[in-house]
Amino acid sequence: MAKEILFNIDARDQLKKGVDALANAVKVTLGPKGRNVIIEKKFGAPHITKDGVTVAKEIELADAYQNTGAQLVKEVASKTGDDAGDGTTTATVLAQAIVAEGLKNVTAGASPMDIKRGIDKAVAKVVESIKAQAETVGDNYDKIEQVATVSANNDPVIGKLIADAMRKVSKDGVITIEEAKGTDTTIGVVEGMQFDRGYLSAYFVTNTEKMECEMEKPYILIYDKKISNLKDFLPILEPAVQTGRPLLVIAEDVDSEALTTLVVNRLRSQLKICAVKAPGFGDRRKEMLEDIAILTGGVVISEEKGLKLEQATIEMLGTADKVTVSKDYTTIVNGAGVKENIKERCDQIKAQIVATKSDYDREKLQERLAKLSGGVAVLYVGAASEVEMKEKKDRVDDALRATRAAIEEGIIPGGGVAYIRAIDSLEGMKGDNADETTGIGIIKRAIEEPLREIVANAGKEGAVVVQKVREGKGDFGYNARTDVYENLHAAGVVDPAKVARVALENAASIAGMFLTTECVIVEKKEDKPEMPMGAPGMGGMGGMM
């Protein structure tokens, strides 16, 4: 396919038009008084959002050069969202500011490479300043609530829900978001270990009202193969039944013949038993069975360990205070495992989380960690309409991810103030040459931009507020929601340090690429010939007979 090529100033100008088109659409959402953006959908209701990355992802421009510029900034927003969970709009605003300032200097004849070096040096200095300003969150759930509230577009209800969810399942616990049936937003907590496998036969049910099998102080047999005949199973089944305690069987599968025998015994002699399939697949199944064994103080009966089912003894069975098995889920509460062993297993999983490169694997490992260490909280998001539901879920997701970022690297004063305080660290900083120093100056000017934009969206004059905030010290800043200058930390206006850091690093990275671009190649649009209305001379076919 033929290509079009554009060089030098013309190339950068076209790219910048694309950057501005996308950034101007995204930045209206910044700050507590930021506005919503309505996105048309081909099917269904339009999507209303105040989430920067959602807006960015929807933008495709008709002009190929401009669209390339827009895609560059879209990358900033997406990467910041992936890395820090929030700060997508801030990153977009910073990228636009660095590009605009940098382009003026490059057009005036400055060396793009030297400017990029100056930008990189300044960013490293600002990141140091942000880290120095950060205050750890620890177990202070009030601070967690503040971060969640700000990230959820200043919705105190969502902030409180996330803090409550973290209280219930600890900071490392898994919190998932689901749609509620009604209009209320609530928390549900699944205590203990729950996995998504239910009973193999409805005849195991003990509570017909809830259609659940409930067991108090059961023995738990964990087997990693299929139970195909009852002969191998009897040596452990008989002594377990004689104790009078219920028995939960977790196996890869139970053959229909063996299952029928268990069901018949359950019905005739009130044998307290329930069989479920093992959770997961492949290697993950082995790991999850090992987790269950450690949690319940049992042993996985596996031929890999040299153990056969017929050799199993009562000592190899796990136990727990309570087990509930429904059609789809099995929940084990208060397993009788040794605390030290459980902690050791948790540490092992944490090490795997750090080492893994795959997001999917990391998510699954975090789920396993939560199930071992405390449980899973579910945030049921309720709303009056589907449109509101989508918007609210976006905000809850933002808030949850920002809260995790805050726990990781601490919190800083919000409202763009941390960047303003970082300007002092750039005072008097010089590069190796004049153009590098210009690059440092570009960052110095650009990091004012998030505050200017927050103020502009609140209907005030940015330059005036920036000057007043610069004159203050520490946490003193402008609270756009209440239109008051105050101590932002005390007022609960805080941001995760990680979000501010990642937003600036990603914005500077893409802007640096942009400024050092000398040529843009895009596909040439080919005019498609219109389809002919009909072949000539085909009319008047009446006399064919």
From Swiss-Prot:
Pfam families: Cpn60_TCP1. It catalyses: ATP + H2O + a folded polypeptide = ADP + phosphate + an unfolded polypeptide. It is an enzyme of class 5 (isomerase). It is found in: Cytoplasm. GO terms for cellular component: GroEL-GroES complex. One of its GO terms (molecular function) is unfolded protein binding. The keyword Ion transport does not apply. CDD domains: GroEL (cd03344). ATP binds at residues 29-32, 50, 86-90, 415, 495. One of its GO terms (biological process) is protein refolding. Its EC number is 5.6.1.7. Keywords: ATP-binding, Chaperone, Cytoplasm, Isomerase, Nucleotide-binding. Forms a cylinder of 14 subunits composed of two heptameric rings stacked back-to-back. Interacts with the co-chaperonin GroES. Together with its co-chaperonin GroES, plays an essential role in assisting protein folding. The GroEL-GroES system forms a nano-cage that allows encapsulation of the non-native substrate proteins and provides a physical environment optimized to promote and accelerate protein folding. Belongs to the chaperonin (HSP60) family. This is Chaperonin GroEL. The lineage of its organism: Bacteria, Pseudomonadati, Bacteroidota, Bacteroidia, Bacteroidales. The gene is groEL.
